[in-house]
Amino acid sequence: MAGNANSVDEEVTRILGGIYLGGIRPIIDHRPLGAEFNITHILSVIKFQVIPEYLIRKGYTLKNIPIDDDDVTDVLQYFDETNRFIDQCLFPNEVEYSPRLVDFKKKPQRGAVFAHCQAGLSRSVTFIVAYLMYRYGLSLSMAMHAVKRKKPSVEPNENFMEQLHLFEKMGGDFVDFDNPAYKQWKLKQSIKLDPSGSELVSNSGMFKDSESSQDLDKLTEAEKSKVTAVRCKKCRTKLALSTSFIAHDPPSKESSEGHFIKRAANSHRIIDIQESQANCSHFFIEPLKWMQPELQGKQELEGKFSCPGCSSKVGGYNWKGSRCSCGKWVIPAIHLQTSKVDQFPLQSTALPNMVNFESEKVNR
């Protein structure tokens, strides 16, 4: 087995088995990681101007994830790739790696990998934690504890921790890029980079069909039975499926977000406090193709959505975010108003008068 389990090294920390963590110093100093720890693979989570030549010369197997330690980088997009890289180091030549099909918890590791970033405190830690969740089925808190007990100073930034929480909600094994929470997070991150939303909506590929067969094809029959359709209350044009909804959890009544506070004009004086409503007044939703003319054409920070069938107001958007009647802030906010639409089970036979806007356009 790689390394000496009892050795203490400030630059290279053994986390579990053949998994080692550290900063850039061992790379700069050309430490013989192979001779010292039997390390054969190096995961560099850092932006190199040039990959250090000695790493190649010494025959290490390299994986470079060129990212910064910031509040906007999407690290989730790399988890499947880096987990596979670490797998192939620790458990070489396996026929199957999926943790859904095979259990390696009692399987001896046969390799050693060194994951590093600049300081070994945030970026590289994030990928090791993701691997421990993926391979050993650990919760996020357990995986963080497994790293912190060996290196207490580690502290992934808030952005990376938020994504690790998302990964945990996805099941902690593979990244689900169609997960509504992930899509909402991507929207929120894009607004951080461009508060106007113009860069986001300039990509026509981000607009989704109002009735996406791709979403439905991924569902089991039991899940399909729970899908609902939303239609304009006035003309019955189908506007969306519930598979496009972006879920939000109403805040607790005890929290400040769970109350609406009214202040006097030009003053901080509170003149009224009301509790948030139990029922939500909005369906927050992904950008849909029928919204494209409004979002791409006008490029405003906020606006209204009109039904493509009858032009009645059915919703709105605000790139800075808006507040649901339940009190929850959603950023960015793209929504349909529950008072302007009807919601029915998709598989219900009680929808004889529903108009499918997309098919109507084709037939005209």
From Swiss-Prot:
GO biological process, one term: autophagy
Pfam family, one: DSPc
Protein induction: By nitrogen starvation.
Cellular component, GO, one term: nucleus
Further details from the record: Present with 7570 molecules/cell in log phase SD medium.
Catalytic site: C117 (phosphocysteine intermediate)
Protein name, per record: Tyrosine-protein phosphatase YVH1
Keyword Hydrolase attached: yes
Domain Tyrosine-protein phosphatase: 11-173
Organism listed in the record: Saccharomyces cerevisiae (strain ATCC 204508 / S288c) (Baker's yeast)
Known catalytic reactions: O-phospho-L-tyrosyl-[protein] + H2O = L-tyrosyl-[protein] + phosphate
Alphabetical keyword list: Hydrolase, Phosphoprotein, Protein phosphatase, Stress response
Family: Belongs to the protein-tyrosine phosphatase family. Non-receptor class dual specificity subfamily.
InterPro entries membership: Dual-sp_phosphatase_cat-dom, DUSP12, Prot-tyrosine_phosphatase-like, Tyr_Pase_dom, TYR_PHOSPHATASE_DUAL_dom
Function: May be directly involved in signal transduction and/or cell cycle regulation. It is necessary for maintaining growth rate or spore germination. Could show both activity toward tyrosine-protein phosphate as well as with serine-protein phosphate.
